[in-house]
Structures are given as structure tokens and as C-alpha cells.
UniProtKB/Swiss-Prot annotation:
Protein name: Protein PsbN
Function: May play a role in photosystem I and II biogenesis.
Major subcellular location class: plastid
N-terminal signal peptide: none
Length: 44
């Protein structure tokens, strides 16, 4: 249980989970009001 690979795996899992959570927060939370939509800016 104390091998470096175990702790490295846990670290990567936590890093991936936190980046995913932050991306969902920015994409759908309150900061999403500041995001621009390039499709709305484009005029045909």
C-alpha cells in the first residue's frame, strides 16, 4: 500500500477530478455569464 505508484495514481486521480470540477463550474456556473459565444458574434 505504500508504493510510490499508489500515491502517484491517487494524485493523478485527484488532479483529474479537480480539473473536471473546475471546468464544469466555469462552463455552467456563474462565470459562464462572462463567456462569449462565437456563433452569436458571426453574421452571415
Amino acid at each position: 500500500m505504500e508504493s510510490p505508484a499508489f500515491f502517484f495514481t491517487i494524485f493523478l486521480w485527484c488532479l483529474l477530478l479537480s480539473v473536471t470540477g473546475y471546468s464544469v463550474y466555469v462552463g455552467f456556473g456563474p462565470p459562464s455569464k462572462d463567456l462569449r459565444d462565437p456563433f452569436d458574434e458571426h453574421e452571415d
